[in-house]
Amino acid sequence: MKPSTEWWRYLAPLAVIAIIALIPVPAGLESHTWLYFAVFTGVIVGLILEPVPGAVVAMVGISIIAILSPWLLFSPEQLAQPGFKFTAKSLSWAVSGFSNSVIWLIFAAFMFGTGYEKTGLGRRIALILVKKMGHRTLFLGYAVMFSELILAPVTPSNSARGAGIIYPIIRNLPPLYQSQPNDSSSRSIGSYIMWMGIVADCVTSAIFLTAMAPNLLLIGLMKSASHATLSWGDWFLGMLPLSILLVLLVPWLAYVLYPPVLKSGDQVPRWAETELQAMGPLCSREKRMLGLMVGALVLWIFGGDYIDAAMVGYSVVALMLLLRIISWDDIVSNKAAWNVFFWLASLITLATGLNNTGFISWFGKLLAGSLSGYSPTMVMVALIVVFYLLRYFFASATAYTSALAPMMIAAALAMPEIPLPVFCLMVGAAIGLGSILTPYATGPSPIYYGSGYLPTADYWRLGAIFGLIFLVLLVITGLLWMPVVLL
């Protein structure tokens, strides 16, 4: 049990619920809608403070709403309908998130990541890139970026990708050149490599729909509010110019703005070659894994008219089991996958209720009224900038997305002139790219920050510089390119 001083984390969400519930119902809302919003806000506060795991917070919120559904979920008119059974309807709502295709897509992607890890293919790819490109420090930065880029489409946990696969490899590189943490020698090469590790993780998290769990949460929120969605291919094509630009620009930019003292050397390639020799030649399991991943990516990009992305993932997982790339025990024991599965499904359920009770449409109209007189483009850019900068106040991408994305979507829906697919993709890209702003913004951030190679002042300074560059490029490509491929 946590110390008694931590009890405020438990009480704060309840206090928020009580305070909002006691506020008079705003004009235009029904009482059950306002009470639902009170519980929803309490859940968001719980996700931020985390007195218990996020999935538990969301499940408790759903339980409260479902049990009290005659007062929180359904209107008097609905309850008065002949044959309306609120017990059955509330249960149907409570588990509705688990039938959302987004949930199964991310679960499948987690299994892909397990396959990469179990076969060693992810580590082998990173080592090959380091071996081939590690003779010059700048090229080593590109090797880190390309390693993240290859792993990102099938690793929906950026923490598992950045902190679990890439960081354990690159943390071995600086000492090869006597670049030590918490020492004046850290700037020799270690600082550049570690900054490239975290910035590459943030960039690749924005490039692919399946590179980060909050991306899929956003699509689930979008679908529940508007019945519109973005496919894997839509996201990839919409991000393509920005992706190419960032992948090519960022290693060089880091090299210029945070220059390493050591520009070249042979120790890193020799170390990578030794590690690869220890792994042995490419085995049959790795070859099968590679073939399935290429097939999945091809279908995700080009097969949207013939097969749903979630069905692609589901089928590939079945093949991975049949081909013994992973075992059934690997699936049932994957705590990270099941954790995300439950909290993501629960949050989508809660967002669906927010829309069903009429809160989203009411809030959208309220925003539209206050924003009338401004051009849709100006409003869209302003909303993206505000959403992006609010990242400073959140230490969890999940809480950040859950708290702010529904409001952003509501604002866009209230102004038909704003193209929803374009706006939502810009919001999605901002989730990943904005994670560079602080040393607490996303899972891998504290790992790289705590490596001893990135002093506090350097991290905040570089985060602000790269964050501003990312935001400017996102707005430009969002206005010029995304409408071409998404509308």
From Swiss-Prot:
What is this protein for, i.e. what is its function? Answer: Catalyzes the uptake of tartrate in exchange for intracellular succinate. Essential for anaerobic L-tartrate fermentation.
UniProt topology in membrane: Multi-pass membrane protein
Q: Does the keyword Endoplasmic reticulum apply?
A: no
The primary site where this protein sits is membrane
The protein's organism comes out as Escherichia coli O157:H7
Q: Which InterPro entries match?
A: CitT-rel (IPR030676), SLC13A/DASS (IPR001898)
Q: What UniProt keywords are attached to this protein's entry?
A: Antiport, Cell inner membrane, Cell membrane, Membrane, Transmembrane, Transmembrane helix, Transport
> What name goes with this protein?
L-tartrate/succinate antiporter
Spell out the family assignment given in the record's similarity comment: Belongs to the SLC13A/DASS transporter (TC 2.A.47) family. DIT1 subfamily.
| Subcellular location as annotated | Cell inner membrane
TM helices/strands, residue ranges: 10-30, 33-53, 54-74, 93-113, 137-157, 189-209, 236-256, 292-312, 313-333, 340-360, 370-390, 393-413, 418-438, 465-485
Give the GO cellular component terms, alphabetically.
plasma membrane
* Record's catalysed reaction(s): (2R,3R)-tartrate(out) + succinate(in) = (2R,3R)-tartrate(in) + succinate(out)
> NCBIfam families attached here?
dass
Q: MF terms per GO, please?
A: antiporter activity
A Pfam family that the UniProt record links to this protein: Na_sulph_symp
